[in-house]
């Protein structure tokens, strides 16, 4: 499926379904500093509301109240684009080159600011793009700076960005892992949807100048004492017949709930893919499954 420059802007709901949603996510992971970040607007135009979560986290600072910065805003007015720029509660996205290059800034005066340039390293990976529903992912290089109450930290890392639009119920039952690794020469994305009676895999392997869809992937997980994924190996194959084995270990973690329907452990991972890559392992649970799992620990 293909995109055009209009897909970099907000989409018009095709139904009056109140849970019709649109997200516009940017992220970064900088192995030199150990810092990861996320900028996550969630729009529900049929309800005329929006939400925003901005977070930066580091090793051993894994909660919203111990992270260097974490703030969520709810019940905001949905933003609109004015030319190539949209603004939402201190966050600004400027489209410098549609589908390829962006200027991301954030201002929480006297507390935290971000000034980042995000450049696509490859074409968008597009599982679906219709007026009714869409999703795509793009590996990026992220360069710029963060400022924590006067302390400036340079950022030079990688990130995935994604866009989604269409109905998204807060009452969905979901168990997902969203996993990626990126360097200047390639990237991979492995998305596992784990249902009670099925397990589906999607994503891609982009290596040696060739991108191909992943057709099989099995993961072997190690967890720490807090049940966070600490190490994982993926073994599988892609549509071109290439077999792969990719192993990574966690550098940091953040307990994050950016929307009512999903909780995730967001973890920076360093991978042995393509002579070294960085990315994230996002361990995603809907609240019902998380509650069931946690209740098993009751005595």
List each model region and its residues:
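Structured soluble/peripheral alpha/beta segments that form catalytic or ligand/cofactor-binding pockets
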Residues: 1-299
